[in-house]
Amino acid sequence: MSLKKLITEVAVVDSMFDVEQELMNIKESILEQVIVEGVDDPGILKCIFMAGGPGSGKSFTAMEIFGIDKRLKTSFSHTGLKTVNSDSAFEKGLKDNGIDGKKLAQIEKEDPELWDKIANNDDSIRNKAKAITQLQRKFYEVGRLGMIIDGTGHVYSKIQKNKKHAESLGYDTYMVFVNTSLEVAKERNQNRDRVLSDELLTKSWGDVQNNLGKFQNLFGGNFRIVDNTVYKPISGQVQKAVNNFVKKRVYNPIGKKWISTARALKNANIIKK
């Protein structure tokens, strides 16, 4: 099975809420092929974190920067980067349970039992979606495929931990911070498929803002801010910086060693192509 065919199959699987079982059925031999066939893929060993509060327009920004088709449930960009985002699985879970995402704020206030089922219980819809997405991410990591980690960034330690994990696998890391005013975020929230309460949105927005300086220190030169208060084309400066990062040779010594080993295996036909 070619890498292209495998990725296509995962795209189909990702549109299903039962993706966990599907991913667990992938054979080790196929994963080995991902390792050797993917070594020369675009975006290999590049990991870009998207951060920004609810309503900041991260999806719009990702679409603009990476050429991601917003109509796709699973996003595979022309850069070779694969989007890791639990929103699709979460929205599918809500739909399967007959829950209107636009009523989440109302449910949080009026139906604590249902809200626990959605967001708080160990087996909540949200936690199941996160678990599924984590499995998908692990699949990408096996082949060191390039990734866009799409999250809010309201918990600094989580980003810090995920960055360290990615770098331990050999990835070069980068962050695009999508910024907007609280007023605009609240306005956009009302037009989202999942409407959050003002209290939850305000807290998340504040947490993300408080982490801005920390993120700048954490990522150093591999950090760009996008002002998305008004939807507009991404600045050429940001676009160029991100493109250069993706296209540059892998800098991480662990990643360099992985590429050398995988390429040697591929050239020696140790694992059938």
Regions found by a protein language model. Name each.
Residues 11-39:
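N-terminal pre-Walker A segment at the start of P-loop NTPase domains
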Residues 38-45, 139-141:
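Phosphate-binding P-loop
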Residues 53-54:
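The conserved Walker
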Residues 58:
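Conserved lysine of the Walker
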Residues 61:
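Hydrophobic positions on the alpha1 helix immediately C-terminal to the Walker A/P-loop
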Residues 65-143, 157:
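Conserved substrate/cofactor phosphate-moiety recognition/catalytic segment
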Residues 154, 167-187:
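Conserved phosphate-donor/acceptor-positioning beta-strand/loop module used by diverse small-molecule
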Residues 182-273:
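Conserved GTP-binding G-domain of TRAFAC-class P-loop NTPases and closely related GTPase folds
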